[in-house]
């Protein structure tokens, strides 16, 4: 049986959430509360029994793999295979707020009907990790300023692509984290199959409440998450 802990994480007090008191250099402590559902056993991308959202508020943070087994994960910032050329996560996990997870699951159900599904490159990002990224690349064109934080830090943004039901990535024209005009949504100087793949991704995500960034075909923000607070909890690693 899976065991879960519901943690109220005060970022100015120690009440059980790993690294909850960590201060980012040059930043004041985050002093609000977030509820986080933590799997206290070894992580498993496909748990035998899926959890439900019953009784959870829309702002609760959850591990997406505990609520759906229909996604694929390639969490790039837990590796050096990213534009930073640095590993900034201790281990690969995909956490979001409940409202983000609900929208992602609904969108993915529609994708599956079209023979594809979502593959994740990044999800919730602790604010302290945003500072690590800023130290490596202190350029707001590529990394959001951690003082204000980003929607990734709020649990409402994801970096994604589409794969077939057998796990083969659709061609989107560039790799994740390619910064150039070829990755722009408004770049139509691409083969038709790539344009069709991007259109399917964008139109479906928008249908379920997400909006995109013009320069990154992979990045989607949940509109309903814009006013949420920046968070800084870190998930446990083995």
Where in this protein do the model-derived segments appear?
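Sec-dependent signal peptide recognition
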Residues: 2-8
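C-terminal motif of bacterial Sec signal peptides marking the signal peptidase cleavage site
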Residues: 13-16
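Short, conserved catalytic or interaction motifs in soluble domains
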Residues: 19
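Extracytoplasmic cell-surface/polysaccharide-interacting catalytic and binding patches
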Residues: 22-121, 136, 140-215, 221-238
């Amino acid at each position: 049986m899976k065991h879960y802990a519901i943690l109220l994480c005060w970022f100015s007090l120690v009440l059980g959430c790993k690294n909850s008191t960590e201060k980012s250099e040059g930043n004041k402590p985050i002093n609000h509360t977030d509820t986080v559902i933590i799997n206290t056993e070894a992580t498993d991308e496909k748990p035998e029994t899926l959890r439900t959202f019953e009784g959870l508020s829309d702002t609760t943070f959850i591990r997406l793999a505990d609520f759906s087994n229909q996604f694929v994960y390639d969490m790039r910032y837990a590796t050096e295979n990213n534009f930073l050329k640095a590993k900034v996560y201790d281990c690969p996990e995909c956490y979001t707020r409940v409202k983000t997870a609900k929208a992602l699951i609904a969108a993915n159900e529609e994708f599956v009907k079209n023979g594809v599904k979502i593959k994740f490159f990044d999800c919730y990002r602790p604010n302290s990790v945003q500072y690590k990224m800023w130290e490596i690349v202190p350029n707001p064109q590529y990394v959001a300023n951690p003082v204000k934080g980003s929607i990734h830090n709020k649990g409402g943004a994801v970096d994604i692509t589409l794969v077939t039901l057998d796990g083969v990535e659709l061609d989107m024209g560039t790799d994740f984290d390619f910064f150039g005009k070829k990755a722009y949504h408004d770049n139509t100087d691409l083969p038709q199959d790539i344009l069709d793949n991007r259109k399917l991704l964008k139109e479906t995500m928008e249908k379920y409440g997400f909006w995109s960034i013009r320069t990154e075909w992979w990045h989607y923000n949940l509109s309903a998450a814009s006013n949420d607070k920046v968070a800084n909890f870190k998930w446990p690693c083995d």
